[in-house]
Amino acid sequence: MRNWRKTMSAWSFEDMRSLQNKRLRDFLRHQVYPFSPYYKKLLDDNGIAVDTINTTDDLTRIPFTSKKDIAPDEENPARHLQFILIPDEERIKKYASKATLLKLAKAKLMQGETAMRKMLEWEYSPVFVIFTTGRTALPTPFLFTRYDLQVWLLHSSRMGEITKEQVDYQPGQMWVNAFPYAPHGGFWQVYFSTSLQGIMTLQSGGGKILGTERILDAISAGNCTGLIAVPGYLYHLLRKAKEEGRDLSSVRFLITGGERAHPDYREKVLQLVRECGAQDPKFVAAGGFTEQKHYPMECIGGDKVGYHNFPDLDFFELIDPESGERLPDDASGELTYTALDGRGSIVIRYRTGDIVEAPGLDYSPCPVCGLRICRINSVISRRSEMKEMYLTKLKGTLVNLNLLYVVIPTIPEVNEWQVELRKKNDDPYENDEIILYITPQEEGQEETIRNTITEKMRYAMEIVPTQIIFEPLDKLIVRLKLEVELKEQRVVDNRPV
């Protein structure tokens, strides 16, 4: 889309939805239905003619896709492959758009059949892969073609352009990308965004590659204005910087993604960087999920204005997590995603498992950047952390472990923490136990922490921990795997399956 910022700032909601309707129609008819083994079978099995899906409202007729439909397992390790667009000559002739057929015919006429096949190979042959982190299922590969990489570069360039302006980036400044170097999208989104916008960035690879001390050396060298990392590692870096008396006075903003960033967490990391000399630092969170294949973020300087998504690439809806009924955009509900463009691995009506607080989806102009796009409320919890717990032998209790991320960080005496779920005596027929591992801020705070956590958990969650174990920080950092894993191991379920 040319002049995308001008268009997305000036258009009406009706203009935006009209574009999405057209993109959806074209994508389903010319790409998804003919070339996706999974969705062709899904529509055929449910008696849904693809040419009857004309608007985003019509999507409600299509059954949902969830992680269990995609994730490989021992019985079907290749399950994810059925979500890849796989064209063949016959289906291209039958389903491709007139513009595509004309382009292919022209290439064949002017340059020969080899050139035409290379065009198709460029568009459909996978060349890049990232993985889900496997927190709720086995790690799932999502494949990108060169066409997909162009879409990702487009999205990254847009987000980079907005961020670069909002932080007033100047030549000579440097950002530090401390996302882990891995087949995971966070690192690559930052790499693409900064490279395309000409932003000098140390692509450190995180603690596992460059190492925490060297990253801190780079940040404290004097010209680092931005620090980007997953939440747990960002907190670890800043805590370490404070312990070592590092000068971080040049840092002007923090960006985090890959995990939720609750308000208390935001204030904690901002306070840490202020204590290292930063003046009026800003915090911004990025959201998204692997299945989206690119990652939205907030505007810098706004007060949690929501994750920005571009309507020409994605469509979102909210549903009731129990009934599956579509909800109004301003409600609270489970976020459900449909791709409007792409090749490689594609999902339609994908249930993310993320519960978005009201107003879930906001299409009013962003108060910071002015874009009228889909902004997802950044207050999100995970359905996967609603656990069935057998705290007595009589019945199961649904425990919302998302509340731990609200309860524990509000206790000022707590420096670091982890929760382990296990069975009493490791007996699968025994009661469940909730074990908390805590590092106090200072010695002598153990009893205060024990009483406060017990009281807060009883009030907020109607449960109390089975046991609270106090450990030194270095031991808990090892437990959390802060420097060796993509995401910290905050809640560990060690109960037998």
Language model features: what each stretch is:
Residues 1-29, 33, 37-38, 174, ...:
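Active-site glycine/GP-rich loop and adjacent strand/helix microenvironment
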Residues 2-6, 66-284, 292-302, 306, ...:
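Active-site phosphate/ATP/adenylate-binding loop shared across adenylate-forming ligases
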Residues 1-131, 137-158, 221, 432-435, ...:
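Nucleotide 5′-phosphate-binding alpha/beta core
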